[in-house]
């Protein structure tokens, strides 16, 4: 007899969402979220949804790569039991999904959504139910000094307390300093996270630290300024600045967390489900915590679907000091209903009663 959790169908489709403004990081910018939606339908009609959000300037992954990886699952996943989600995720990885972390993430999201939705369990409880609220920042992407100041004022007008600033742009340290100073003047009480996306050299990092110190600006966090493999440089940046440093591109697996801690290369790791999938992110969070590293939850340019999974993940596990779950607000349209609620910068998942709570609009 067919199990109620047997997978009946797998649908994979592009998910293209225009942005209000280009989302720029040190490696480039994009004006459209070119993502992928995967839908799993179980034998009893339950549907689970997952999102791949590849970000070419971040790690080189593209929508075409995610589509190709997920479409391979259409050949072997039907007839398999979604209740065996961990084994199915491992099989997808072994069949090539591991080559595209955002695709791995999308499949795992869809599996977990279907399984927890069917049994009436919210995903935040599945992850541990530690809490239901989380405070997010909002990002000022790369751009001009005037645009940075305007964005900072708009962020504070939304009631958001923390501001993340993309640095490492074409203007070099002087350009970064001018933008950060303008943001600081516009929102002097806002904790600032300065994110280099691995695009700043050691020399430029030292110059920017000196400039910030001279301007009287003390960031709350320096996020991945240096190349992802430069652990010694990151440790030196901590010593030189005296400020806290977060690893992002460097931290993709549990082994990465242990290497970072051993090298003294960061005090915080930014966990993104899109890097290697939900399961790998869970293992990374466990290893980071065991190594004494603080936790941050972030993402790529993701819709409410993927961001709600990240919110469930972070609130359910608990102990996340920083959160950067703002990209749904950069999108000109929202193709989904449901997900987390937000007031100012405070996210609540309490209203999610089964799965991640997000469904495509009719």
What are these regions (language model features)?
Residues 2, 8-19, 35, 301-362:
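Flexible C-terminal active-site loop/helix
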Residues 2-44, 48, 52-58, 333-336:
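Structured beta-strand/loop patches that form or line metal/cofactor-binding pockets in enzymes
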Residues 7, 38, 45, 107, ...:
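Conserved, mostly hydrophobic/aromatic
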Residues 41-118:
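Metal- or metallocofactor-binding catalytic centers and their adjacent structured scaffolds
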Residues 117-142:
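N-terminal small/glycine-rich loop or linker at the start of catalytic domains
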Residues 121, 138-150, 154, 173-176:
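Active-site beta->alpha loop and helix N-cap motifs at the rims of alpha/beta catalytic domains
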Residues 155-166:
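Catalytic domains of carbohydrate-active enzymes, especially glycoside hydrolases
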Residues 167-308, 332-342:
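Catalytic core of soluble alpha/beta enzymes
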């Amino acid at each position: 007899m067919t199990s109620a959790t047997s997978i009946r169908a797998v649908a994979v489709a592009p998910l293209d969402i225009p942005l209000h403004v280009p989302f720029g990081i040190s490696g480039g910018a994009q004006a459209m979220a070119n993502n992928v939606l995967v839908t799993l339908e179980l034998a009893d009609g339950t549907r689970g949804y997952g999102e791949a959000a590849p970000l070419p300037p971040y790690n080189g992954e593209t929508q075409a790569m995610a589509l190709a990886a997920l479409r391979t699952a259409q050949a072997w996943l039907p007839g398999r039991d979604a209740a065996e989600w961990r084994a199915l995720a491992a099989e997808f990885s072994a069949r090539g999904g591991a080559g595209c972390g955002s695709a791995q993430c999308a499949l795992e999201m869809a599996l977990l959504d279907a399984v927890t939705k069917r049994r009436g369990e919210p995903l935040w409880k599945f992850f541990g139910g530690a809490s239901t609220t989380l405070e997010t920042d909002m990002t000022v992407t790369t751009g001009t000094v005037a645009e940075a100041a305007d964005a900072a004022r708009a962020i504070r007008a939304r009631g958001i307390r923390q501001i993340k600033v993309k640095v490492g742009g074409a203007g070099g340290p002087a350009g970064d300093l001018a933008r950060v100073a303008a943001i600081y003047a516009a929102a002097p009480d806002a904790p600032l996270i300065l994110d280099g996306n691995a695009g700043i050299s050691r020399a430029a990092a030292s110059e920017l630290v000196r400039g910030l110190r001279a301007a009287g600006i003390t960031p709350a966090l320096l996020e991945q300024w240096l190349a992802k493999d430069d652990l010694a440089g990151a440790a030196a940046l901590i010593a030189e600045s005296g400020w806290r440093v977060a690893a992002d591109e460097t931290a993709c697996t549990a082994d990465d967390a242990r290497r970072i801690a051993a090298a003294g290369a960061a005090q915080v790791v930014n966990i993104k489900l899109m890097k290697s999938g939900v399961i790998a992110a869970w293992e990374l969070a466990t290893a980071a915590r065991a190594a004494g590293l603080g936790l941050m939850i972030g993402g790529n340019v993701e819709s409410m679907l993927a961001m709600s999974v990240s919110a469930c993940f972070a609130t359910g596990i608990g102990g996340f000091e920083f959160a950067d779950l703002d990209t749904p607000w950069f999108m000109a349209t929202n193709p989904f209903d449901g997900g987390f609620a937000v007031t100012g910068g405070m996210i609540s998942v309490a209203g999610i009663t089964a799965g991640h709570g997000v469904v495509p609009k009719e």
